[in-house]
Structure formats: structure tokens, C-alpha cells
Amino acid sequence: YIYVYGYKTPCSSKMLSKYVSPYDATVVSSLKKAGTIFTGKTNLDEFAMGSSTENSAYGPTKNPWNPDFVPGGSSGGSAAVVSAGSAVASLGSDTGGSIRQPASFCGVVGFKPTYGTVSRYGLIAFASSLDQIGPITNTVDDTRIIFNEIQGYDSKDATSITPEFTKLDNKKIKIGILKELMQEGVSNESQNEVNKVVNLLKEKGHDVTEMSLPLTEMALSVYYLIAPAECSANLSRFDGVRYGIREEASTSYEMMNKTRSVGFGE
């Protein structure tokens, strides 16, 4: 969930139901300077933990194409609002697919930038070594416009970098296509679209080469080790003392226990 000054920022959780953003996230400041008008916040899975936008204290988000289907998640509200035509663009956060998957489900464009190219200052963290803010729009061109405004080094984010692509100046580059990502489970339609892009890049003079990362098959298992561990550390701050709601109790331990029991989940 991304801070916008003066907006409630509940993270789709009872825990932060009354919490109001005290400042703008860096990406929000950048877009405001560019003239962007923010119209509201969207729904997501609680604290970005989910892939369907059904796990929210405020109810599920429906897919604009068919309300019987989910919009994906965790940034399902961000994808749905663009798909429905209620906004030209939105922002989401992507840890393990939370921008790209709902964008796919809703028929729009979602982009997870390279880690560090977009400041995470003002993002409520899920898994800090994986989280990245990115745009959701209707077209690749719109995605490029939003990304160009939010990318760049930010001293407020210790993981921020100066993106190397700013130095390319349309030079011919070498691009790798991962063999492991084009195997069983990928639809013919998806493979055909990737092949179209590969051919386009070759026509532009770029060196497009098939490459292999044999450990790719272990990626999901590793993700489920890293993400829950970092999530546990990040959610520990919501204890009824510093942030969020507070349940009354006779001891601090009991207070934290009651607060977290009421604040998290259903």
C-alpha cells in the first residue's frame, strides 16, 4: 500500500482502519509534480498477501470483465480500476506477481520494474527484498510514461539505484530469453506474443539470445522461504503500540495478542 498524504491507508486490514498517510510516497510526489491527479485508493489483499483480492477486510474486488471471476492480486483493485475505465493509470506493488498477475487477469498492462529503480519510500512493506512499486495502465506507451516519472535514485530508500537504462541512448543491446519460462504451462497464445516481440527486437538490430537458468525451478520454493520470513518481521510493527488499532488489556502482552487477533484476518 502506497502513502498518499491525507488519504486513509488501511492496507485492506482492520489493523490500520483509521490510519491516515502522514506524507506522500516518493512515487506519489514525483507524479504530482508531473501533474497527475489522484482520485482515490483501491482494494487489495490484506497487506498484499494474496493473489485474488478476496482477502480484504472491506470485501472482494470483482473482475470488470466478469463479476463471477476474480481480478487477481494482490493489487487487484489497481488492475480493476484501470480495466473498468475509472482511471487512466494506477500504481501497485509487486512482490511475487502482484502487479503482473492482476493486470493479466484484467486485460491491462502491468509492469514490475527492476528492483531498486523505483523508490520504495512510502510503501508499506510485505517482503522488503522483493517488493517493488510499478504502474498499471491500458497500453505499453502509458506504462512507459508513468515509469519514466517514478524511476530514479532516491536517497530516502537505501536500496535505490540510478537505472542503467538511462545511459543506453538507444544502443543495440543483448537480450536474453529464458528457456525455462517458455515451457509446459505457457499457453500457445502467450508464446506467440513473446515471439512477436522477439522478432520485433531482432528487426531493431538487438541481439536476442536464448539463455538458461537451471535453478529457475527452485524459485517458487525459495520465494516461500524469503517472503513469509520478511513479512513476519515487517508485520511485527503492528502491535497496538506504535501503529494501528489498540485493544485494551491488563498487560502489554495481552494487549498485543488481542490487538493482532482482532486486527489481522477476518
Task: Walk through the language-model features, giving the residues of each.
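Gly/Ser-rich catalytic/binding loops embedded in alpha/beta enzyme cores
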Residues: Y1-T95, N195-N199, E203-G205
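Short helix-loop capping/hinge segments that flank enzyme active sites or metal/cofactor-binding pockets
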Residues: Y1-S13, N170-L178, A229-E266
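Acyltransferase
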Residues: V186-L213, G244-S250
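Acidic, glycine-rich active-site loops and adjacent beta-strand->loop/helix elements
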Residues: I2, L44-D45, T95-I99, A103-F105, ...
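Short acidic, glycine/serine/threonine-rich loops at helix termini
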Residues: Y7-T9, M49-T53, R100-F105, G122-L123, ...
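A short helix-breaking turn/cap at a secondary-structure junction
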Residues: K112-N192, S250-K258
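Glycine/threonine-rich beta-strand-loop-alpha-helix active-site module
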Residues: T95-Y121
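Charged, often glycine-rich, active-site loop that binds/positions anionic groups
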Residues: N55, G59, S221-N234
